[in-house]
From Swiss-Prot:
GO terms for molecular function: 1-phosphatidylinositol-3-kinase activity; 1-phosphatidylinositol-4-phosphate 3-kinase activity; phosphatidylinositol binding. One of its GO terms (biological process) is positive regulation of phagocytosis, engulfment. Residues 598-766 form the C2 PI3K-type domain. This is Phosphatidylinositol 3-kinase piki-1. Residues 1472-1601 form the C2 domain. Keywords: Cell projection, Cytoplasm, Cytoplasmic vesicle, Kinase, Lipid biosynthesis, Lipid metabolism, Membrane, Phagocytosis, Transferase. Its EC number is 2.7.1.137. GO terms for cellular component: cytoplasm; early phagosome; phagocytic cup; phagocytic vesicle membrane; plasma membrane; pseudopodium. It is found in: Cell projection, Phagocytic cup; Cytoplasmic vesicle, Phagosome membrane; Cytoplasm. Its main location: other.
Length: 1607
């Protein structure tokens, strides 16, 4: 035969078998099949083709051609991404059918070279196996087979030496190949898979094609975004076609016996459908209308039936629903307080939270004490005293009592409360550890306290309140069993079945057909009531019953039919949140055995999918299933099916029959961790997708998933069938292998019927008992190199990037790390085997580990640590946190509840116990739970139920008798505010006056209600609301019509903004992050004086926000000068000067501005807060900067016409720059601002885990914009790959970039113009009764009567532009010393204009005529006469005019009057010595010298009195050729430049430090050819060499250095 003939024959054979081999190529023999009779012939054809190509083909490596002509064993390479980026090319492996003994003796290809790793000690590059103490035989767990890499290697290589296999990663990104150890090398290590064969446990059935190839590490085929593991979505789902789930429905008749064996594993009642046996008359059952007989041996389960050899009768009571608590309620009852919190419990009081640092650096503060409202005669003024900041509150209380000794009864206990609130300060706290103290000092106020009786506040309500049970919110379930409907349907079924049997006995064909249809209709109605689920066995038994031909068959099938109905009802009740169930036919008690004795494999069947959504039916043609096992977020094993499944309409409603079977042979049952979860996902092929172009890569998308624990809440392994709702995936699919048991929640959710194997025993996971203690080792006993390397790993604090060798090293040295609290996450992340035998060792080291800081313990609440004892240990550490930490972390605690496996958990107990600390915690926990109940009831019902049950448990067990009433009144207040807002929005055509009138009318009704029953505000429950200040309330001008409400209290008012149809969870989260950043800064001694305010979401898209008083937006400030104000750089500084009329107040406001502006620059940059414009940046009159409106964050930038409006890292404008520097030239204040920014930024970088853990916990909260991508965004913004010095350089450059950007100004202008167009009449409208340069009105009574005023002279000032000011002397009656004020001619004009407007008949005039330029000396000289005449005429008017409030306001002293030399050149007061900040660092390992050039100050002016343009040069002398010259950038026009640049010298041996000198010089860049040296200093590098070397091999010399002036 010629070569052409052989090739032609091969092609023809390939064409004949191409369709049959498509599945083989995509599955690659990975599917367990029951062979058909044609299998030998098919194999012969395959071998024939192989022989032909082996004889003529040059080899697979050089093969090219189409698939139709390819060899039968050739597989095309599908370049489809797996779970994240894979750096190496891959192809799907060929899987050979070998058991573990065969695989163990097979040479394996070596692993790809690992990525570069940091240097580590040589002796630990291939660490030896750790020594492990022998375990008791009872706890011995056979080692599992290794978990190989997720993708195989295609190239072949010689065998490699045997080394311990690295641990399996918790992420799907490991690339290590498996290796197998000999028996002599066996060891028991929890971080290494067991590398031995298990012939005794492997299924050695003759059907070798049914084995799952575990030589290839399982790649999870869910292709979903799994939080905390994957870093990017996998866009390819084509790998689902390469499956290995067994499709039982695809077998031919010859394999029916094998199918029956599999089905019996899941259903002991299974009867083969191919059995020819017929029921005998002796085994017949009584008529259906009797319903009485002895019960069957075991309840039926959906999916099969057990062969019954005796008569069965069903009592009528077996089909009646009975009341019974569901499993969730039983778990909730077990929640209890564990006494974890070692603090005083005061559940009847509001106690202010305290911090573990001092809120101020002051040593003493002024405290003013008042008597609270409870005293009958409370007319005494407050009494002041000076208290030390570190003094205890009980001592201060005693001092306060001594001030009121004669006025107070002595038989009561007293305490100090926050002024105006019913919130006591903790008696054992320090004055400086109370946040209220810092709040008062932040606003420049005295610390005002109320003295009151420390006793529960008894509240009397005048109206009768409704029952709590009628008021409390309940999650509405659309699929909870309706008892009446089900029982009525069953009654109809019994009637129709009786009619059918009568027709059957009569033999009437017409009646039989009619009654048969009615029975089907009733069953269809029953299935429709129960979520549209139609179990296949139920439908088949109904068909058999209606197709019976003999009486014996009728009786037999009737009872089978009823058994299936009973099983269906019982299972549905268990799978919904129902308080009903159906009594079992018989209670069967199985013996209980520990899972440690079970060497079997886990077996699961996927039966079918029901309640198919309409869009699935219309948009998808085929469906594929994936079945994975998870421990936390670590994949243990998995299967997927390659055979497409389609929607069938043969059973009442559309369904997807699956009939898929999986047997997990990677691990034995005894080796699965306690927290193992089963995750099932479904994907679909899009209809009419372009599959012709790529037949092997159709458009497949993931549609939904469900997750269920392997063990129930009592730690018994699940058995039998389950109804599981599939969570529909949204636009951004996310698989969550954690959380509560999924209950059926919505009639629209598809339902999966999944079955576990039914065992003869109840299998439970035993309690882990520590029978021995570990002995901690001294960290100092390790060699220095290992210590340094471990400390570096701990300092990095990144558990997700640990290399294999790092994991080995950390686990081996775990006993040396017990005194390093920060190392515990690294140790636990290095452990990959969490089976029974290995968790004992983890629990041993937990007992000896150093106490964790609460910030570290937060990480263990993440789902990647599912072990219940690990989480309980974390809760114990959290309980040691300060009350302020616990209070502000309540949202994270409640979010972490969604990661708990069961309702009863240590975290749930901890939250319950927190609610009893004080009423502050009680109300905060209640409303945090409430908002999640409302938001999650639709998309995450199990979590919503969990929150609601905990909420109910807290309310029922709380000791405060008025709690339920208080909460009910809060709900009523919120409903009333919602009603008012809806009323205003419904009248969109009303004018502003009409809208305000309607608001005040409704608020008047609310005010009367509050007078009867005072309400605790949800946002501030310690505030007793007694009414509303109606005249101060208003409506904000936006589409949602948010309300500004000012509530009246006993001693103070409380202002809020109430919003509806606006998700305020984003704003609340940003404020939480801001509070955490502020806590980090203050605990490190950096107080940036940040203004924080409360945001409280109280339900679905509604909430309250605290209003900050005495503030204005930047737009409101700019509007004072009209549209041109947005272009005025001085507008903000003038506004601050106007509101701070003395020098001390202005300097304090300027300091507040510098600090808070630096803080908000950091916050907005790190969190990526966008949509920044001049209407959401605010300034208080005390100088604090703060932002509002956080709808755009985490890189979600505001867009306009397709362009990004936010072009800068953060908003830092020239207006802010002018406030900081008192003008346009950089000063020392600018250096201070930059230092604050860089210090704050580096503090956050060092505490990154505190921030990132909060983000990780909230990543699954469904808050818009918060996900794992936002975590990556924050980590990227923190520049974690840079050193502190490099980060300082980068952030300084960003400050300059933001300041120099023109886009911010353009954005402000565009927003201002838009506001001007929408509100033109009221835009920049000035108050005619006030002067623009004085914020308040002053009168004769406040300032004293003016007797005479005299214009003395005029002076030229720079503010900062040139202006002529008139100095006026003011004499007041009975005041010996006159005062001086400085006013411009424009201000005299403003006074004249407003006086004429108020008094039209006034005859006083002011000559304002000037020719051309008015701001010149000659014109100022002429105007002084006009001004003097104006003042003479003014004070000759009647008192009503000359002594009105406008006149006294004009002559009131302001800032420029108190400090007339504010704008005089500062050079006169400057030191003559120039200084420069340097940081010189030498690294002896890298042999590098780094010179960081920071600031320079006190540079001299140039000869022409101009500001210099400095830059810095450095040399390492001696250097005759100046080859070592390096220089910084030029800083223009300043005597106080900031460089913040790092200059580096490489290849710098340590030996030459002794002979070298660092020369640093400051130069002025006068032009291209005009440059001269201004200052110079020389630093011998010997000083650096003499310094001690740090742990990182660095010697550092830093500080301010004096420079010598060059002549």
């Amino acid at each position: 035969m010629s070569d052409d003939e052989e090739l032609q024959l091969a092609i023809e054979i390939s064409k004949k078998t191409f369709k049959d081999e498509q599945k083989l190529r995509s599955n690659d023999l990975d599917l367990i099949r029951f062979e058909s009779p044609d299998e030998p012939a098919r194999q012969r054809k395959i071998n024939q083709i192989k022989q032909l190509y082996e004889a003529n083909s040059p080899g697979p490596s050089s093969y090219s051609g189409s698939l139709a002509t390819s060899p039968i064993d050739f597989r095309p390479v599908y370049n489809e991404p797996r779970a994240g980026p894979i750096p190496h090319s891959q192809s799907y492996p060929r899987n050979y059918f070998q058991d573990w003994s065969a695989i163990a003796s097979t040479s394996q290809p070596p692993a790809f070279p690992p990525p570069p790793r940091p240097p580590k000690p040589e002796q630990y590059k291939f660490p030896p196996a750790p020594s492990v103490p022998l375990l008791h035989d009872r706890y011995f767990v056979p080692p599992p087979p290794p978990v190989p890499p997720r993708h195989s290697r295609v190239q072949q290589s010689p065998p490699v030496p045997i080394h311990p296999t690295p641990p399996v990663s918790s992420t799907p990104l490991r690339h290590s190949a498996p290796s197998f150890a000999s028996d002599s090398q066996q060891f028991l290590s929890p971080i290494k898979p067991f590398e031995i064969s298990f012939n005794s446990t492997v299924d050695t059935s003759s059907n070798q094609t049914g084995s799952h190839d575990h030589s290839i590490q399982y790649q999870p085929l869910t292709h979903l975004y799994v939080p905390y593991v994957m870093h990017s979505l996998n866009s390819s789902y084509g790998a689902l076609l390469n499956g290995d789930l067994i499709d039982l429905s695809a077998f031919e008749d010859s394999s029916n016996a094998s199918q029956d064996e599999i089905r019996k594993e899941f259903d002991p009642l299974f009867i083969s459908t191919y059995s020819t046996d017929t029921p005998s008359p002796d085994n017949s059952m009584p008529a259906v209308n009797a319903y009485f007989s002895k019960p069957i041996d075991e309840p039926e389960c959906v999916g099969g039936a057990k062969l019954i050899q005796e008569n069965i009768e069903f009592p009528s009571s077996s089909f009646c629903l009975i009341d019974c608590p569901n499993g969730i309620e039983e778990q909730v009852k077990k929640l209890c307080k564990r006494n974890l919190i070692r603090k005083d419990m005061t559940p009847d009081f509001f106690i202010a939270p305290t911090v573990d640092y001092m809120v101020t650096t002051a040593s003493t503060v002024k405290v003013v004490v008042y008597k609270d409202h409870s005293w009958k005669a409370n007319k005494s003024n407050g009494k002041a005293m000076i208290c030390a900041i570190d003094e205890k509150m009980d001592i201060i209380t005693t001092q306060a009592l001594s001030l009121f000794d004669s006025e107070l009864p002595t038989d009561k206990e007293y305490g100090l409360k926050i002024y105006g609130l019913n919130q006591f300060l903790s008696s054992d706290s320090l004055l400086g550890s109370n946040l209220y103290t810092g709040h008062c000092l932040l606003n420049g106020d005295d610390v005002k306290l109320d003295l009151g009786v420390f006793a529960p506040n008894s509240r009397i309500y005048e109206q009768t309140l409704e029952s709590w049970n009628l008021m409390k919110s309940q999650v509405k379930y659309s699929t909870v069993v309706d008892k009446e409907d089900v029982e009525n349907t069953l009654g109809h079924l019994a009637s129709e079945m009786s009619q059918y049997e009568i027709a059957f006995n009569d033999g009437s064909t017409l009646k039989l057909s009619s009654s048969s249809q009615r029975v089907k209709q009733v069953i269809m109605l029953l299935c429709k009531c129960l979520h549209g689920i139609v179990p296949e066995k139920l439908y088949n038994e109904m068909q058999k019953y209606l197709a019976s031909t003999t009486e014996d068959q009728l009786v037999h099938h009737r009872n089978d039919f009823l058994r299936e109905i009973h099983s269906f009802l019982e299972l549905y009740c268990r799978c919904t949140v129902s308080r009903y169930n159906i009594p079992p036919l018989q209670i069967i008690t199985k013996p209980k055995v520990e899972v440690l004795s079970k060497m079997d494999f886990l077996q699961i069947m996927l039966n079918s999918v029901h309640s198919i959504p309409e869009h699935w039916q219309s948009q998808y043609s085929e469906f594929y299933m994936s079945l994975d096992l998870y421990h936390g977020t670590q994949v243990l094993d998995g299967f997927s099916n390659k055979v497409p499944k389609t929607i069938k309409n043969d059973h009442f409603f559309p369904r997807i029959p699956l009939d898929l079977y999986a047997k997990f042979k990677r691990l034995n049952l005894c080796q699965y961790p306690r927290e193992t979860r089963i995750v099932v996902s479904i994907s679909g092929t899009v209809r009419n997708s372009a599959q012709a172009a790529n037949e092997y890569n159709p458009d497949i998308v993931m549609l939904g998933y469900c997750s269920v624990p392997l063990y129930d809440e009592n730690l018994f392994m699940r058995q039998g069938p389950l109804f599981l709702p599939l969570t529909l995936l949204k636009k951004q699919p996310m698989l969550k292998p954690f959380g509560p048991y999924p209950y059926i929640k919505d009639a629209r959710d598809p339902i999966l019927i999944m079955s576990f194997k039914i065992w003869d025993t109840e299998i439970y996971f035993p309690n882990v008992v520590i029978d021995m203690q570990c002995i901690p080792q001294d960290f100092a006993t390790l060699d220095i190199e290992t210590q340094e390397y471990l400390l570096e790993l701990i300092e990095n604090q990144d558990t997700s990037t640990l290399e294999t060798d790092d994991q080995d090293l950390i686990w081996q040295k775990r006993l040396h790390l017990t005194n390093q609290p920060e190392a515990l996450p690294l140790v636990l992340s290095s452990l990959q085997d969490w089976s029974f035998g290995f968790v004992m060792r983890v629990y041993q080291i937990l007992e000896e580990w150093a106490p964790l800081r609460p910030e570290i313990a937060m990480e263990f609440l993440l789902p990647k640590y599912p072990d219940e004892r690990i989480r309980a240990h974390a809760v114990q550490s959290l309980a040691r946190g300060s009350t302020d930490f616990l209070y502000h972390t309540i949202p994270q605690f409640i979010e972490a509840l969604r990661f708990e496996l069961y309702e009863k958990s240590a975290l749930a107990d901890f939250i319950l116990e927190l609610s009893f600390v004080s009423l502050d915690f009680t109300f905060e926990i209640y409303w945090q739970l409430q908002q999640r109940v409302d938001h999650c009831a639709v998309d995450d019902l199990p979590y919503a139920i969990r929150c609601q049950n905990l909420q109910q448990k807290m309310i029922d067990e709380h000791e405060n008798p008025n709690l339920k009433t208080d909460i009910k009144l809060q709900h009523e207040l919120l409903n009333e505010l919602d009603s008012i807002q809806d009323d205003l929005r419904s009248k969109s055509g009303d004018s502003e006056i009409e809208r305000l009138h309607r608001l005040r009318t409704r608020l008047g009704i609310l005010d009367s209600k509050l007078l009867q029953n005072k309400v605790r505000l949800p946002i501030c429950p310690a505030f007793d609301c007694t009414g509303v200040r109606i005249e101060e309330c208003s409506v904000f001008n936006s589409n949602a019509k948010p309300l500004k409400i000012v509530f009246r209290g006993l001693n103070m008012n409380y202002s809020i903004i109430h919003k509806r149809d606006d998700d305020m969870r984003q704003d609340a989260f940003v404020m939480k992050m801001l509070n955490e950043m502020d806590r980090i800064w203050k605990s490190n001694g950096l107080d940036l004086r940040m203004i924080t305010f409360r945001i409280m979401p109280v339900g679905y898209r509604r909430g309250m926000g605290e209003l900050v008083l005495n503030c204005a937006t930047l737009m409101e400030i700019q509007k004072e000068e009209g549209l041109r104000g947005v272009l005025n750089d001085e507008i903000l500084r003038k506004w601050l000067m106007k509101h701070n009329s003395d020098e001390f107040a202005y300097k304090e406001a300027q300091e507040n501005f510098i600090r808070s502006c630096a803080g908000w620059c950091i916050v907005t940059y790190v969190l990526g807060i966008g949509d920044r414009h001049n209407d959401n940046i605010l300034f208080t009159k005390n100088g604090h900067v703060f932002h509002i409106d956080f709808g755009k964050y985490m890189g979600d930038w505001q867009m306009a016409a397709g362009f990004r409006r936010d072009r800068v890292p953060f908003v830092f404008t020239t207006e802010m720059f002018h406030v900081i520097n008192n003008g346009r030239a950089p000063t020392q204040y600018n250096q201070k601002f930059i230092d604050y920014c860089c210090k704050a930024f580096n503090h956050l970088r060092r505490n990154k885990n505190t921030l990132t853990n909060l983000l990780r916990i909230m990543a699954c909260s469904d808050i818009p914009g918060i996900n794992m991508d936002s975590l990556a965004f924050v980590e990227n913004n923190l520049m974690l790959d840079l050193s502190d010095t490099d980060a300082t350089v980068q952030f300084t450059a960003m400050i300059q970039n933001s300041l120099g950007s023109a886009f911010v100004r353009l954005n402000f202008v565009a927003h201002t113009v838009a506001q001007f167009i929408s509100s033109r009449p009221s835009f920049s409208k000035q108050d005619p009764n006030k002067l623009s340069f004085v914020p308040e009105l002053y009168t004769e009574n406040s300032d004293g009567r003016i007797s005479r005023v005299t214009v003395l002279k005029f002076e030229k000032h720079c503010i900062p532009n040139k202006i002529y000011m008139y100095k006026v002397e003011v004499h007041r009656k009975n005041v010996a010393v006159s005062s001086f004020i400085y006013r411009s001619f424009a201000e005299f004009e403003e006074l004249h204009t407003k006086l004429r407007a108020r008094f039209p008949m006034m005859a006083v005039s002011l000559n304002t005529i000037s020719n051309l330029r008015s701001n010149v000396r000659a014109v100022a000289q002429k105007r002084i006469i006009h001004v003097q005449k104006f003042l003479i005429y003014l004070f000759n008017q009647v008192d009503e005019i000359c002594h009105c409030d406008l006149v006294y306001t004009f002559f009131h002293s302001i800032l420029r009057d108190n400090k007339c030399d504010t704008y005089i050149d500062e050079s006169l007061d400057m030191p003559s010595q120039c200084q420069i900040y340097l940081k010189i660092e030498y690294n002896s390992v890298k042999e590098t010298l780094s010179v960081f050039i920071g600031h320079a100050k006190y540079l001299a002016l140039l000869q022409n009195n101009q500001q210099p343009d400095p830059y810095v040069k450095t040399y390492v002398r001696p250097d005759l050729r100046n080859q070592s010259k390096q220089k910084t950038q030029v800083v223009r026009g300043t005597r106080h430049p900031t460089f913040n640049q790092d200059l580096n010298y490489t290849e710098f041996p340590i030996e030459i430090l002794s002979t070298r000198v660092l020369e640093v010089s400051i130069w002025n860049n006068g032009g291209y050819l005009v440059k001269h040296k201004m200052y110079m200093l020389c630093i011998p590098l010997l000083k650096v060499k003499k310094l001690a070397e740090s742990r990182k091999n660095c010697r550092t010399l830093e500080g301010w250095f004096n420079c010598e002036k060059c002549v």
